[in-house]
A protein has these predicted regions:
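Histidine-centered beta-alpha loop that forms part of the nucleotide-sugar donor binding/catalytic region
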Residues: 60-61, 83-87, 123, 185
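Conserved alpha-helical substructure of the radical SAM core
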Residues: 1-80, 91-97, 237
Length: 238
């Protein structure tokens, strides 16, 4: 991301949860960020539980050995998605040989101590490989495979815009600075629907740009330029 690196403050997180509570019971900690980097990840999980939310964490898994004791027994934690494919593009990680061993140890510990679901993601298949989705490896442990996709980018080639997406229907994202965007792929905040620190979440949902996106996809059309340059959206057209 080109945005300034920063950690969401605990007070801001509490405010966001109070705003979104009428609309969902589930939180997903990601959006082009590594949630296990946050120094207060345990506090965030505690607050989530206090306010009645279940949490899904998406991580590349490299920090699991360091922070597992802060998260593994938290009652709010519902599922951990581990992006195995992230290792393919991480040239700076010095412990690749130990990576899978640490993941396996973590899975064993999770199964012994909790009911948390583990999803191992391998989203780097090429077109010659047919993915098998939702392979059950063990109780509450799954392997999910899929093709590589291109992240939306205003500099990318634009398609005809025809198609559907679940953005704003079953997901919405709040960035660290409070910017609200339609989905977790808009990590740069290009489609800025408003700021949850400045406007009520209910007002942002009723905003003209928000409504235009929803109505557009109801007609099978992407009204936003970034959406017309999103490779992930094409998955829903198959």
């Amino acid at each position: 991301t080109k945005r300034k690196p920063q950690y969401m403050k605990v007070e801001a997180f509490e405010h966001i949860l109070d705003q979104i509570k009428p609309y969902t019971d589930y939180l997903y900690f990601h959006v082009k960020g590594e949630p296990l980097l946050h120094p207060h990840i345990d506090t965030f999980l505690d607050i989530s539980h206090e306010k009645g939310f279940q949490v899904n964490i998406t991580t590349n898994g490299t920090l699991i050995p360091k922070v597992k004791e802060k998260i593994i027994l938290k009652p709010a934690l519902r599922q951990i998605n581990i992006s195995l494919h992230s290792m393919g593009g991480n040239k700076d990680y010095d412990h690749k040989d130990d990576y899978m061993e640490h993941i396996q140890e973590f899975i064993k510990e999770v199964r012994e101590k909790s009911d948390v679901i583990i999803s191992l993601r391998q989203w780097d298949l090429d077109e010659k490989t047919i993915p098998e989705r939702g392979i059950k490896i063990a109780d509450k442990v799954y392997l999910n495979q899929d093709y590589q996709f291109k992240w939306p980018d205003l500099g990318a080639e634009e398609d005809d815009g025809i198609g559907f997406c679940y953005g704003l229907r079953n997901q919405i994202a709040v960035l660290v600075d409070g910017t609200v965007v339609p989905c977790c792929l808009d990590g740069e905040g290009v489609i800025n629907l408003g700021n949850i620190n400045e406007s009520r979440f209910s007002e942002i949902l009723e905003g003209p740009r928000t409504k235009a996106i929803i109505e557009g996809f109801s007609r099978q059309y992407a009204v936003e330029e970034l959406c017309r340059k999103c490779g992930y959206r094409k998955r829903f057209n198959k």
